[in-house]
From Swiss-Prot:
It comes from Penicillium rubens (strain ATCC 28089 / DSM 1075 / NRRL 1951 / Wisconsin 54-1255). InterPro entries: FAD-bd, FAD/NAD-bd_sf, FAD_mOase_fung. The lineage of its organism: Eukaryota, Fungi, Dikarya, Ascomycota, Pezizomycotina. One of its GO terms (molecular function) is FAD binding. This is FAD-dependent monooxygenase adrH. Its cofactor is FAD.
């Protein structure tokens, strides 16, 4: 009888020990769904200089899994943001504090390595996480699927989830230096800086004990596509930061200060895009494997975690629709189509907002430069409402209890937005156009001074 039960056990093979991959492993573990994680690297949590922002839409899912408290202990809530411009003008906003008050989850930043450590250390059965296994082949076998690794190992299951990122013909218009620095006098924990330059931006988050997480995004000379996108070395990161060392990002803090105090830094090309195909037979992809975005709005990891919540919920529902038999390939395909139908538009909306954010922050046109400098601070209410409305529509795992914080947060009046990112910004652009209509000379003057 035990052998019969084992024969009918549905198994998920997760390719990639990423944040998305390990979060899915935790979700499946909570549902008692058999699974393994195959990771190509020798260790799950290497220090690569990257960091992530955790927003309420990602935090609520990690909280459902019992992981958020460990993460929160390593962070300082962001409560205030400062924005600065090339002409030394600046202003501040308490939008992060408002988000914290609304959702009971703050915006926080921490090392990607630390997030992976928390996910790994809190995972209940580490024998399910297999490292040093680079996938070389995927086989579809009709009633099952197999993953073959470079050393000849074969792992057989019923569903393969790609959570390790892929290289494909996505566009590359920006390069980014990610860095983590020691405390810098003048940068206070719980604050965050956006410096909008011409064709570049510098964004910092100041975490627990003064640890500074930062990135510099530089617009490239042209649009590239993989595999022709530039590749960068540590020397390239040093060269870019050296050229920008005197750029003042806030008060008397410069890019040079970030670089001199760095603990680790790396440089990479930023791929942007969202795929139309999310699954094939028994194979499905999520997170960075299906949508890639710039870090400007801090939603890359959070969007991946939402993918996990929806996919795990659907897998669990499908399996329990018939407890005696494994789901057929047809059932699996139907489930994966539903996964895409539920996640495609939200992910696309986030991708579009991220894409716009990169171009807005780097002032890649004179109109964006003018709106950022002269209009942006006066439409804070619009930005706040749009942000809260978007976050309030975040997905959760449907077979786990909703966190208590969600029930006490004041977000019930906000429903998932049906508007596109372009429509969400209509008021911003209308305000800007009105400015030029009332002051016709302003457009030509600013165009000549900014260009």
């Amino acid at each position: 009888m035990a052998d019969s039960m084992e024969t009918h056990k549905f198994k998920v093979i997760i390719v990639g020990g990423s944040i998305a991959g390990l979060t899915l492993a935790h979700s499946l573990s909570k549902a008692n769904i058999d699974h393994i994680v195959i990771e190509k690297r020798a260790e799950i949590a290497p220090q690569e200089g990257a960091f992530i922002g955790v927003w309420p839409n990602g935090a609520q899912i990690l909280d459902q899994l019992g992981l958020y408290q460990s993460l929160e202990e390593l962070t300082a809530p962001i409560s205030r943001m400062h924005l600065s411009f090339p002409d030394d003008y600046s202003f501040s906003s308490f939008l992060p504090k408002t988000i914290h008050e609304r959702f009971k989850y703050p915006i926080v930043s921490l090392d990607r390595q630390k997030v992976l450590e928390i996910l790994f250390q809190n995972y209940p059965d580490k024998s399910n996480i297999i490292t040093n296994q680079r996938v070389s082949e995927v086989r579809l076998l009709g009633d099952s699927a197999s993953v073959v690794t470079e050393d000849g190992s074969v792992f057989r299951g019923d569903l393969i989830v790609g959570a390790d990122g892929v290289h494909s013909p996505l566009t590359v218009e920006y390069a980014c230096v990610f860095g983590i620095s020691r405390p810098i006098p003048g940068l206070r924990s719980g604050e965050h800086i956006n410096h909008y330059g011409d064709k570049f931006c510098v964004i910092t988050f100041h975490g627990k004990d003064g640890r500074v997480f930062w990135f510099i995004i530089q617009k490239l000379d042209r649009v590239y596509t993989y595999p022709n996108a530039p590749r960068y070395s540590p020397n390239d990161a040093a060269d870019l930061c050296g050229k920008m060392q005197n750029v003042v990002i806030w008060q008397d803090i410069t890019v040079g200060d970030l670089w001199k105090t760095k603990v680790v830094a790396s440089m990479t090309a930023l791929e942007e895009g969202i795929f139309e195909t999310w699954s094939l037979n028994r194979i499905v992809i999520l997170g960075d494997s299906v949508h890639k975005m710039t870090p400007n709005i801090g939603q890359g990891a959070n969007t991946a975690i939402e993918d996990v919540a929806v996919l795990a919920s659907l897998i669990n529902r499908m399996i329990h629709a018939d407890d005696l038999n494994k789901p057929s390939e047809s059932c699996i395909e139907t489930m994966l189509q539903e996964y895409k139908s539920l996640r495609y538009e939200p992910a696309k909306s986030t991708y579009q907002r991220s894409r716009f954010g990169a171009r807005f922050h780097t002032r890649d046109s004179w109109l964006k430069a003018v709106v950022g400098r002269y209009v942006f601070q006066y439409v804070g209410g619009l930005i706040e409402n749009r942000t809260i409305k978007t976050l309030a529509g975040g997905d959760t795992i449907d077979f786990l209890p909703r966190p208590d914080r969600l029930e006490t947060g004041r977000v019930a009046q906000f429903q998932k937005s049906e508007e596109s990112p372009q429509r969400q910004w209509t008021l911003l652009w209308v305000s800007s156009l009105a400015l030029f209509l009332f002051f016709p000379w302003l457009g030509s003057y600013l165009h000549s001074t900014i260009s």
